[in-house]
Amino acid sequence: MPLVDIRQMAAEAAAESVGLGAFNVVLLEFAYAQVQAAESVNRPVILQLSQNAIAYHGGRLAPLGKALLSLAEEATVPVAVHLDHAEDVDLCRAAVDLGFNSVMYDGSHLPDDENRETTARVVEFCHAANVAVEAELGEVGGKNGVHDPSARTDPQDAAQFVTDTGVDLLAVAVGSSHAMTTRGAVLDTDLIRDIRDAVPVPLVLHGSSGVPDDGMVAAIEAGMTKINVSTHLNVGFTGVVRDILNGDETVVDPRKYVGPGRDQVRDEVARLLNLYARR
């Protein structure tokens, strides 16, 4: 089916008090797995391609980006294709030109005034192309090696940021941390509720790989909508591949270990989509 507007997907999820799964793609196999999972449980899904993943693929957006768009268009469930954590404005433009229908401009590393000004410029050209924009206010832990209570978003500042920039979705710092390989993060659900009450757009949780299942359900109940997942899938995929290669040194065909790794990603994405839907 045609790409589905992420704003529509997020609004429907928020109205139903369920989470919207957004999963990062590092290899094409991940995208296949994510779409298959979404189709198996009849849930919408967001395929995310980050600036870091693009750098891994030689800095070329088009080859993998076009593949994601093709998978989305052939899917039998709603799919959006999203540029994740883009610090480069030109990369945001390139994604829009290629056909992505959502981008995340990450100016959280910039001085506050510059972040707001640049984010507003990205919103202007994206909205002209009917492309949604996500932004981040308050650095989520992990990007600078931190994971402490000081990494928090102020609700009123968040509301003002949305007013100043016009973004469609807002990623907030509420206790999660990027790139966690264990699931022990404790989210501030009271803060999530306060931000939800103050902000007129859907909220996004980055760093959800470090959050246990019960914490995710509580966060969604408190008002979190778009749930980003990356490291958690990498851990599962790599674990399967490692076990196969350690168990049989004669294996040389990548399909013999990449395939099972892909299937593990598929099964975990399906499980998470059901969890976020509170099934």
Where are these regions (language model features)?
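N-terminal basic/disordered segments at the start of proteins
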Residues: 2-4, 22-28
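Alpha/beta enzyme core
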Residues: 6-12, 16, 28-53, 61-76, ...
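Glycine-rich beta-to-alpha transition loops that act as phosphate-gripper elements at the mouths
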Residues: 25, 81-87, 201-213
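Extended, intrinsically disordered, low-complexity segments
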Residues: 244-279
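Cofactor-binding active-site loop characterized by glycine-rich and histidine/acidic residues
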Residues: 58
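Generic enzyme active-site microenvironment
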Residues: 22, 82, 134-136, 204, ...
